[in-house]
């Protein structure tokens, strides 16, 4: 057993660490906490050097995206007639083949874009998301300018995905950011706005700051 006085004495060296919190567990009483409080009276918490990592996840895997991250971009119909046909026909086998090939090639995240002529994107996005999560544990990056399609995909996604993308246009921020907040998604932010790509670096930084502070 330890007395309240000894407990407080043993805790005193930790004052120098400028802890954010100190307390007692089972076995301590109000007297323990009273003396502990006197030890830490006036102690100013320090600033933590620990940075929370930026991660995406599925139920069984996660990816830290703070550094270089390999994103597979083949689940995208742009310039791919065969892929567009597969989407119109809801040929999930073809879509899943593209996913598996990218996983085998070392992709860490899979971009998912199902926007093509003749495709009901809001209806197809959740079907593709669910099909992909049945064959791969990699996180998905939902890629669409259709807000309804994004929400439908986010609703069925298991884990924390990333949305591709938003920019500094207020209309885009107002449409996309609430979805990301609602479903806990990360987001790709592009340092452009209604003026396009600005030549001055400080202007792009200002747009990036506008996105992160929105």
Language-model features: where?
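Domain-level signal for soluble alpha/beta catalytic cores
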Residues: 1-214
